[in-house]
């Protein structure tokens, strides 16, 4: 091998010498006669095998340079000869020899490698509507079917076309946006074997067909000197090949700083933020700032205006004449608009510079963030004549204050003050009204009700002073009795623009003098008829009022009490509880869905709240609102519910308040949404799938037991342990048909349970679940007790269930149709859940923490009977009340462990002070639930964003004495039993 190479070198040297001699014997070539350099071997293509030698010789009279190019990469040599001793696949490419005149010759070399048919250049990019080259040149030109193939056998798009070149690769024609992220291989058949290249993923750069979309965070800013100015420009385009900048109007100098932040949002959406800031704005920074962006298609811009003032301001604009005339008994609204920066912190209306009124609304002129204009409306209703005067609106912020005054005059019908006296031969009529009344006199012979003959000019005096500067004007008019020569009636008539009134005076001649006979106007037949009609009308109104008051009125169930002298208590008026406006949530961020429950005056609607927890997050919530038919009482009740919920705070086992809308529209209360509805119907749905190890059959056992008499029998050896009640329908363990029977009409969420929710809770119900529900409700009630809150309507229908089988105590209030709910019995002026109420609540109208404990015992009976109604088959009548009073209680439900029935019996103790507290109940149930359930609940409580508030120990009992503050009437007096 070495000898062969030496011979080759010798021949190469001889060839060079011959060329030199030939060149020296020929005339030199002029620069204009330069020829192409010649390459040996004289071929356009050369095929070698991997490991072979590549030897290329370039001859030219002058200097030559070799250039090797493959996949866009270049390498150079200045020797006339290019030698590669052991060729590799990567030596495949175009070899070019260039002389000093710039003329060149090329040869393409294929290095055949069975292991490497394709040379690969990644990544693969393509521009929309242009051609793109898939760089996969071949190392062996003698293959067949050189083309593109989809990954994993997937077909290529039907409209994709390409052109194959073994030396360059495969060119895809007219790239489309739909090809983005297309996976493909270069493929070929080499000696009957199908070969694939490495995987290419085509990334398409979208063609720019429109100008960028430009927007700013706010279109105008108003600042005080020294405040920070910060505005963000958002540029949207299909790719990052967009330029952007902030420009100040008139190129004024400013100390503004800019910061850029960009990201891709999807495949063909590019976003860039240009944030402009001035840390301490000055008056001369005021002006117009333009955000400018451009791409290859064109440019776009948007502006924002900055106004910097040296200090804050308030400008008031009355929206009506400041002098207002209104008739007696009518309404008027005093409306002002005002501009204020910074935001106003104090607004007030003052009457006659001494008393304030709160019958006003204040709201922004628009929802725009840049809004500085506000509207304030004072509502004056059914104005009386004495309520005229000055009404001054005061508004202030941290810098200035301002005010505007309205002069309100109340137009009143004239009132005759004096008309039936003769003084020194003069008859006087005194009238008061506004505007100033006019008085006319009329005379008619005899005793008449009205006169038609006017009396000539009379002496009329106007009293300059009035009751108040804005009160009635008093007018005096006198007439000489010598004007009248005969017996008769004199009528005084006073009138103004509002109305008129009159009074008459009767006199008769007696000798040479006149004397008054009587002032007959009060007892005329017309007046008598009017008085009778008015009396009948009053009686009718009183009857209607009585009937209205006898109707069951809505009352907030949850009551907050305050302790006095340690034991006795009174209810706190919920309207006096504070409301923190931090709960306010914008109405326009609520999207309402289906109605979850409805009552006579209110309803609960499923809604989506945007930005309630996070600025860009959507959350499903429940919104309680009033129907248009609601009265003032119901509106106040809903506001009271809101105040009670905000006062209580958050706990995992109550339906927590999330927000509210009280400004600019009807009141909306936003609470947590519980997807599984109320616990009562959940239990009834799960009857068929309930798993319980306790299989005792209670179908043949009496339902009621006289607990009081049973205690006495243990002492007195009495054999009268049970009472033969024989209810109309005996208790039978529910059959499958019974279990499928619809529960209660109007139940919250039951009729709207979606398949998605049902699929999400396919697990069966077991005894551990019932114990967990008992435990959670006791925890929630312990929390309410720690807040001095009495529920008054604790039942399974008022317990909601959400994900993780977490129970939450609620009060449906206005949203429950208690009128059509048989669980609520009409007593007095309320509908009450009698079967869940403690004896002291039924007979003495006493509601305490202990009465809630009784209701909790009834709830446990519902729970462990899987949603059966308490006291089944028994109507609420005098017999029912008598049994409760005599100590009869329900026996253990079908699925209740003995320990849970013991808790029920202690909850139903006739002596309220012997019943356990909710804190003690929690401790009792805690011993029965499994460690895993307790552990899961503890973890949920710790991970919950609403942590439990520390409980207050109610071991010191509040005395079970009814508060005089309670408006609820006793259900049944002792004599009715």
From Swiss-Prot:
The modification Phosphoserine is found at residues 742, 747, 822, 892, 960. Residues 590-938 form the Protein kinase domain. InterPro entries: Ig-like_dom (IPR007110), Ig-like_dom_sf (IPR036179), Ig-like_fold (IPR013783), Ig_sub (IPR003599), Ig_sub2 (IPR003598), Immunoglobulin_dom (IPR013151), Kinase-like_dom_sf (IPR011009), Prot_kinase_dom (IPR000719). Its EC number is 2.7.10.1. Residues 1-25 form the signal peptide. The record marks 569, 937 as: Interaction with SH2B2/APS. Keywords: ATP-binding, Cell membrane, Disulfide bond, Glycoprotein, Immunoglobulin domain, Kinase, Magnesium, Membrane, Metal-binding, Nucleotide-binding, Phosphoprotein, Proto-oncogene, Receptor, Repeat, Signal, Transferase, Transmembrane, Transmembrane helix, Tyrosine-protein kinase, Ubl conjugation. One of its GO terms (molecular function) is metal ion binding. Ubiquitinated by SOCS6. KIT is rapidly ubiquitinated after autophosphorylation induced by KITLG/SCF binding, leading to internalization and degradation. The keyword Protease does not apply. Residues 26-525 are extracellular. The active site is at residue 793. Residues 27-112, 121-205, 212-309, 318-411, 414-508 form the Ig-like C2-type domain. It is found in: Cell membrane. ATP binds at residues 597-604, 624, 672-678, 797. This is Mast/stem cell growth factor receptor Kit. It comes from Bos taurus.
